[in-house]
């Protein structure tokens, strides 16, 4: 098997409009495309019978995308996992200036800490911060050499 390319990460959301607003107007991604997803005649790949969803993609055109998945029927239920538990996930973006990203976003989202800097074995440093979107999904921003 050979992986050809990255495609997207999917996040199940409770409030599609709020989450779209956050990722577009706070994080700075673009709204790319959307579909009204209903099962095909041959069934549905999700394993949820007769599922009806709205799939909205945000991201950087020509690059990685985030699929915001809103379950219309049956509605989704809370399934958040603490950051230190199996099954926990996060999305990470590389940024040019971690300190300015933190200053710009600190009043718009919840961060766990201020930016932290780590020295790598080769002597270079990497900065990172962890935070959460409005529905509690984990986000990371890193500044690499």
Where are these regions (language model features)?
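Extreme N-terminal starter segment of soluble prokaryotic enzymes
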Residues: 2-7
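Histidine-centered active-site/metal-ligand motif
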Residues: 8, 52, 90
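Glycosyltransferase donor-binding loop in the core domain
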Residues: 10-11, 93
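Vicinal oxygen chelate
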Residues: 16-17, 60-64, 70-138
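Short, conserved beta-strand edge motifs with alternating hydrophobic and charged residues
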Residues: 34, 68-69
């Amino acid at each position: 098997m050979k992986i050809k390319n990255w495609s997207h990460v999917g996040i199940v959301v409770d409030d599609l409009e709020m989450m779209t607003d956050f990722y577009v107007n706070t994080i700075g991604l673009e709204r790319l495309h959307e579909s009204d997803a209903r099962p095909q005649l041959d069934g549905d790949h999700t394993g949820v019978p007769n599922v009806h969803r709205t799939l909205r993609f945000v991201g950087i055109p020509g690059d990685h995308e985030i699929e915001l998945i809103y379950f219309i029927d049956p509605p989704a239920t809370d399934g958040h996992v603490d950051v230190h538990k199996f099954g926990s996930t996060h999305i990470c973006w590389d940024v040019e200036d971690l300190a300015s990203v933190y200053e710009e976003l600190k009043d718009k989202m919840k961060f766990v800490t201020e930016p932290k800097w780590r020295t790598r074995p080769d002597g270079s440093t990497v900065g990172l911060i962890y935070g959460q979107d409005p529905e509690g999904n984990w986000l990371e921003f890193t500044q690499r050499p």
